[in-house]
Amino acid sequence: MVAVSLKCSVQKNPLIIGHRGAKGHIAENTLPSISKAMALGVDGIEIDVFVCKTGELVVYHDKSLDRLTGGVGLIEELTLEEIQKLTVLGKYKIPTLVEVLDLIEAKVFLNIELKGSKTAKPTDELLKKYLQQGDWRPEHIIISSFKWEELQQFRKLNTAVPIAVLINNDPLEAMPMAQSLDAIAINPNFKSLNETNTKIIQEAGFKVFPYTINETEDIKKMMQLSVDAIITDYPDRVDQVLSN
């Protein structure tokens, strides 16, 4: 069982986080993709959630349906029954967050990205149910989002579950928000990182969990920067670099 350490000490090797499961191997954000990532030995899984029309949290990356399902419209405007009739890449079902939590069973930690609007409250409500029973603990979860207002709402509702602040440009711009949220980490685009800003973030007490690193040379560069985790579509590639 892998938990997210709240301590900011530098670990020997970065954690491996499967991006949308094992997106490079099996269709993203599906149960088979998550199972594949776990079989590849990840420390954590990253997924995306929206709230559908009937209120359930569904695991899906895009606001619109066309790229992955061939459907039309927005996922937030469909009922769960309608969503369950769709398939990702003609083969895989779109899972609910409940199904993902039940599949993982806290064997690895889960990074839930709040992708859609008004996701903080239902995510908090669902997690509190799981945290009151079974093996799940706050340290087995990370909540992240580019929608910082959702992170603020989540923190008002839940002070126990760790938060990571997502940012696509200068990662130092996320530090004030991370401080106000008592966040555990900043999750930047890996291309925005260098030795200086990585050190500044870590010395301020935050972990650095960059996304999405798939090429061997980029994995090596991130290791040279001593990042705390690597979010990747190919967990096996990171493992291979670590092994060498």
What does each of the following model-derived ranges do?
Residues 2-244:
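Phosphate-group recognition and catalysis centered on beta-loop-alpha active-site segments
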